From Swiss-Prot:
Name of the encoding gene: aat
Subcellular location: Cytoplasm
Catalysed reaction, written as an equation: N-terminal L-lysyl-[protein] + L-leucyl-tRNA(Leu) = N-terminal L-leucyl-L-lysyl-[protein] + tRNA(Leu) + H(+); N-terminal L-arginyl-[protein] + L-leucyl-tRNA(Leu) = N-terminal L-leucyl-L-arginyl-[protein] + tRNA(Leu) + H(+); L-phenylalanyl-tRNA(Phe) + an N-terminal L-alpha-aminoacyl-[protein] = an N-terminal L-phenylalanyl-L-alpha-aminoacyl-[protein] + tRNA(Phe)
EC number: 2.3.2.6
Function statement: Functions in the N-end rule pathway of protein degradation where it conjugates Leu, Phe and, less efficiently, Met from aminoacyl-tRNAs to the N-termini of proteins containing an N-terminal arginine or lysine.
UniProt GO molecular function: leucyl-tRNA--protein transferase activity
Chief location category: cytoplasm
UniProt-listed Pfam families: Leu_Phe_trans (PF03588)
UniProt superkingdom: Bacteria
Disulfide bridge map: none
Record protein name field: Leucyl/phenylalanyl-tRNA--protein transferase
Enzyme class: transferase
GO cellular component, one term: cytoplasm
Amino acid sequence: MNDAFTVDDLIACYERGVFPMADARHDESIFLIDPERRGVLPLDGVHVPRRLARSIRGEPFEIRIDSAFDSVVEACATARPGRLETWINTPIQRLYGQLFARGLAHSVECWDGEELVGGLYGVAFGGCFFGESMFSTRRDASKVALIHLVGRLIVGGYQLLDTQFITEHLEQFGTIEIARADYRRRLGRAWTAQADFYRLAAGATGAEVLQAISQAS
């Protein structure tokens, strides 16, 4: 696919359970992925490792929401040691920027002073949140961002957190793998639900986020 693939096409893809990827950062093509097995993180079964919970309570970073979306996507698209290639190319980056402009994409950011040291971004429709990518230049920064995201989704009334695939990194938090048919059933229910990404206050503490997760389990 090329520039003829629009942001409205992308929204339609999400609604039917398909997501975009590129082979490489400098490959302009977009491929649509519809895996037989899908990673999801059940919001009523999130596990926060004890050491990470202690760190989150200690407020190691300032958490900001949607303050530097483009910078988060750019950081996720940047090659780093251990991750020499990325699936985020320029057309995909542009499409997510358009979703953000419509209020349909969000970032959770970890800041140390005025330095962005970690974060994640994803797409929200109805009661669904599709986690797209995360990055970290400091220990635990992406994990802290994920836990703050989870707390925000729980408080906001979301029903589905789609991680696309399951990885060892995500598995430690309770991510599971489900069949395509099961995923589509869950997607259909959550898509029409009402949720509010901003229901949790922007300055919510780590303790408040952990409490929300605990109450949902």
